């Protein structure tokens, strides 16, 4: 068809309009992460990094009160100055979270590895999504910068959809899975059992009845599979 781009050209035009991202979870345990900025946005980033076990350094002339407390109790390291290029040395992950766009862009340019720029996702190479954590269940949501507000709205809906009881149920079936691997001999029956206890219907029962009631039902179900009744 006249005027129609070849497939490879169409793909490159599409890629030029929107970046493509690979969803992944990072293991930050013991890794050096540098946050440039000392305000409320930086504070949120620092708290999430610390929760992930990262070794966090904050670079900023000033700190919010909560960041000061984190520094005082030894949770974070603090470099009390305006950003300098050498501040990123050895960082596994860098987050630019100042209120100065020019500084954020300079940090992004200087970063040699992973870089997230708060409020300017297109300037970095990773996006930090909104997330819901229920024990070992982690659900991440991102609009790739199109609407952070919508990401937050969806996250709040997910928080309601997956209450704390789901975390307890997940821990329970996780431990039960190990027993089932040795107790239910048939691979087909074992897979059937796993599907049944992880079904949408079972999750609905957890929401309605609570973790303990459903766990009792699953234990009974497990014994029937063990005995070969199902």
Give short role names for the model-derived ranges.
Residues 2-71:
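Hydrophobic, well-ordered beta-alpha structural blocks that scaffold small-molecule cofactor pockets
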Residues 53-57, 91-100, 137-145, 158-160:
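Short beta-strand and adjoining strand-loop segment in the mid-core
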Residues 30, 89-91:
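Alpha-helix C-terminal capping/helix-to-coil transition sites in glycosyltransferase folds
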Residues 93-99, 104-128:
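ADP-ribose/adenylate-binding Rossmann-like module
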